[in-house]
């Protein structure tokens, strides 16, 4: 009887704090975000074995393209490589020829590469380890006037 009573008390304490429930919900949300990123049009597509080879071929192709396409992003004009767009769901660069997402993303939250337009901060992030992505990112950074603000 005492064991059951203690079990009930412990369960009530766990349920009343909601910590474990919130932890499970957060884990599910994080897992879903990671899975969305690894889809073909997500910024993490290169991590998916199914798309890895195609993503690297797309990167090699995009490196050769000029960075001259003007697009609107959250109230400002950005210049990105030809035949690419910013994926409206993940804000990552998307190749229109192949449909592959690249590990280059844009944000309205301050990161290290920032550009301020009319008091609003825009950020650029790209995978600096991947050689082709690093080249594309540096071109976008230079053309759009992003500045490195981290120390």
Task: Identify the function of each model-found stretch.
Residues 94-128:
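A short acidic-to-branched-hydrophobic micro-motif
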């Amino acid at each position: 009887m005492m064991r059951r009573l203690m079990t009930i008390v412990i369960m009530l304490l766990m349920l009343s704090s909601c910590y474990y429930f919130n932890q499970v919900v957060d884990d599910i949300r994080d897992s879903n975000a990671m899975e969305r990123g690894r889809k073909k049009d997500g910024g993490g597509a290169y991590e998916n074995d199914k798309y890895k080879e195609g993503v690297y071929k797309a990167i090699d192709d995009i490196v050769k393209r000029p960075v001259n396409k003007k697009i609107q992003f959250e109230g400002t004009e950005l210049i990105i490589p030809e035949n690419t767009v910013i994926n409206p769901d993940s804000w990552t660069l998307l190749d229109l020829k192949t449909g592959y997402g690249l590990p280059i993303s844009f944000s309205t939250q301050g990161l290290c590469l920032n550009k301020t337009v009319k008091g609003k901060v825009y950020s650029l992030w790209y995978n600096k380890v991947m050689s082709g992505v690093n080249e594309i990112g540096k071109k976008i950074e230079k053309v759009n006037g992003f500045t490195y603000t981290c120390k």
